[in-house]
């Protein structure tokens, strides 16, 4: 099924995958499964989808994002909303100890590619265009592997 734990590849021993999970229940189920798969470290890169959903489910998202070894939170994808909720990805990050908030996919790609190790799982999650970040990470890791 497209965008359900879809594995892009394993460049340099680092597995890159993408999942459509965009609700706390889906995040929890997917992350609990990932944590049982034997990876050295599970990285969850989450793109919150809409300001209203993020505001309404903030605490539930935070609980889900405490499951992986490392949570990275991108900027909230507004879709057709304006931020009348005055909520930001850093509000979610503040509730997830050790999380990192990075606005752009470029920043996330740089951070992950500098810090991920062989045996890790990089899992992008969200209902928006975060799959593009998975593609960027995969391509950068592949490039690094080929140019050692």
Task: Tell me what each language-model feature is.
Residues 1-148:
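ATP-dependent carboxylate-amine ligase
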